[in-house]
Amino acid sequence: MKLQKPKGTQDILPGDSAKWQYVENVARETFKKYNYGEIRTPMFEHYEVISRSVGDTTDIVTKEMYDFHDKGDRHITLRPEGTAPVVRSYVENKLFAPEVQKPVKVYYIGSMFRYERPQAGRLREFHQLGVECFGSKNPATDVETIAMAYQLFNTLGIKDVTLHLNSLGNTDSRLAYRQALIDYLTPMRESLSKDSQRRLEENPLRVLDSKEKEDKVAVENAPSILDYLDEESQTHFDEVRAMLDSLNIPYVIDTNMVRGLDYYNHTIFEFITNIDKSELTICAGGRYDSLVEYFGGPETAGFGFGLGLERLLLVLDKQGIKLPVEESLDVYIAVLGSGANGKALELVQSIRYQGFKAERDYLGRKIKAQFKSADTFKAKTVITLGESEVESGVVKVKNNATREEVTVSFEELTTNFATVLKQLEK
């Protein structure tokens, strides 16, 4: 058997991982500006953590979860999304306690797992950036969180991203709308896809989210949930819209957007762009004011989003955005002869200890091959170290671009390499 990575996974090699690290670092710095701290939860959870919170009838639970019974016969699942594990952690670690400053703001970066058909920007193991804010019902929290994602896209230079906005209202609003949707869809039940016929019985709002052609046709003239918002829900949504306007964040109202998870209420949103003439959601989230209570915690408002890293990098690539990740070395040491091996190690280590990026030859190659490596690594300077240099205690350091050289002692290299670099950069 040829050993290969499982279908729907990827190896992120050093040339690409630098781009991932750059995007992750920009995200971390953006989130810090909004007073978010990092949280890390397990990659696997008890099955009920996901099934009960995400919803037993969702595609995630019924079709896409990686779940198994471990050796202790515990029902375990690899996490398919980030919010439920974070809420579980919030409750388990009593972050709702009065001594913990509110709102509690956390972000996470990690792998998620769903058994889906692999395609561009959608893998079975995918990576997600996410944020969760606990303890604020203020619509300003909704807008601040959306603005944080908007700022991240702007910082990365991403263009042509549209904010889609909707409200699911509170429980009373959703119940009224649910019945209106059932009344509308029931006469055309037979024209719906098999999945949506099931959804009509279990969770009719999910029909609005279907990607099947026949379902899209069926819901074209469906009633709008915005017509069923009560006064509280309407006020919340109006304030969100007014604040987005005040921050000059453009948006479109998308009344058919319901999100694929059961725990949302009030504001929901997606950032959508077009790739190869197809719509691609790169960030999505919303408000969930009952989820903490559902996990056994006190009544606690919540708001957050998830953002797919693979999709974000795909958009950056398709839009031709060059990330500033070109790697280079400060110095490359070419080593001539076994007699210079030990001294080369001492030199390269001392330069690294001074805070510089350094590499040396380990393979005993010809000098031409070593110089080629220096060029490949984009080394700013090159030191050639042979047995004669070891004996004299003096080496030549060459600027790899201008070919200018300076002669320096080992002592100067090992104690003050910064000065040597400055000499060559004049």
Curated annotation (Swiss-Prot):
Alphabetical GO biological process terms: histidyl-tRNA aminoacylation
Source domain of life: Bacteria
InterPro entries on file: aa-tRNA-synth_II, aa-tRNA-synth_II/BPL/LPL, Anticodon-bd, Anticodon-bd_dom_sf, His-tRNA-ligase, HisRS-like_core, HisRS/HisZ, HisRS_anticodon
Entry EC number(s): 6.1.1.21
Catalyzed reaction equations: tRNA(His) + L-histidine + ATP = L-histidyl-tRNA(His) + AMP + diphosphate + H(+)
One annotated Gene Ontology cellular component of this protein: cytoplasm
SUPFAM superfamilies: Class II aaRS ABD-related (SSF52954), Class II aaRS and biotin synthetases (SSF55681)
Assembly and oligomerization: Homodimer.
Protein name listed in UniProt: Histidine--tRNA ligase
